[in-house]
Amino acid sequence: MERLNNMGKNSIKKVTVVGTGVIGNGWISRFLSQGYDVVATDPAKNAEVRMRQSIENAWPALEKQGLAEGASKDRLTFELDLAKAVADADLIQENVPEREALKRRVLAEIDHFSKSEAIIASSTSGLKPSILQEDCQRPERVIVAHPFNPVYLIPLVEVIGGKDTSPETINISEQFYQSIKMKPLVISTEVEGHIADRLMEAIWREALHLINDGVATTEEVDAAIIYGPGLRWALMGPFLTLHLAGGEQGMRYMLEQFGPALKLPWTKLVAPELTNELANRVVEGCEAQTTGYSIKKLEQRRDEFLIELIQLLEKYWPGANLKGKL
């Protein structure tokens, strides 16, 4: 613990990424773009080939956004052996599939093979850190650091400690993620799904009901968000959006006038059964929306849009942060 106490964000020089799927590769791209040495490991067949292709696809967007001094794709090493991959790392970012038993086993192995002062961060989208750290000998250095796709562009990362996580680990992690141009949201209370995913899941469930009940197509649901609340949500969250909707009296008027409507049975909340019929309608709808575009092309268009959107956010909402008032 004493060695961990002496660490800071500047002590993190080498990063290891465990698991090179979409999220893992996103982390690799971000770390490299910020000038870090990165070791990646994944036992899957052809993992290294797919990883390097993913980084190549992301790099033009990162160059447009601006690379840190010393940033290079050449600072990436692939190591098949987990023990060797984590041995010298100052921070290990775990991204294995979202299965509790698997994550606990891998995190315990990382804990065993890594340096005692290294921070171990899980990218889990839903599991509590207290559960993930149960099999670790040094649970005080284990946290959840949940990012959002594409990780190399989206700044939010939810940072959560478990019951045994030390305050030092949280502080160092927060500083580190800030240093790589992210917006760490430190969540003090553990809950499944953290914050952002719980909000997104609520919308996702309602969207599935609208498709299942024949109310709308996937394209119409997406359009309802893109040209409506999505534009406002890019600048303000649900609370500030409704605060403005209340006029001069703000949220107080909003709650007085529309609070009773919360009891109307509009929303379903519980997800519909994902039958083959519903799944097919969703898949076919998405494929129809993207006719003529490859996933790679769509990712490039998304990245270009996000870069400009993030720049606009900083221009019009420069005071927004996670520590104080706007």
UniProtKB/Swiss-Prot annotation:
Tagged with keyword Oxidoreductase: yes
EC number: 1.1.1.108
Listed pathway(s): Amine and polyamine metabolism; carnitine metabolism
Binding locations of NAD(+): 19-24
Species per Swiss-Prot/TrEMBL record: Bacillus cereus (strain ZK / E33L)
Assembly mode: Homodimer.
UniProt xrefs under NCBIfam families: PRK07066.1
Protein known as: L-carnitine dehydrogenase
Protein family (similarity comment): Belongs to the 3-hydroxyacyl-CoA dehydrogenase family. L-carnitine dehydrogenase subfamily.
Molecular-function GO term, any one: NAD+ binding
Catalytic activity reported: carnitine + NAD(+) = 3-dehydrocarnitine + NADH + H(+)
Phylogenetic lineage: Bacteria, Bacillati, Bacillota, Bacilli, Bacillales
Protein origin, superkingdom: Bacteria
SUPFAM superfamilies in the record: 6-phosphogluconate dehydrogenase C-terminal domain-like, NAD(P)-binding Rossmann-fold domains
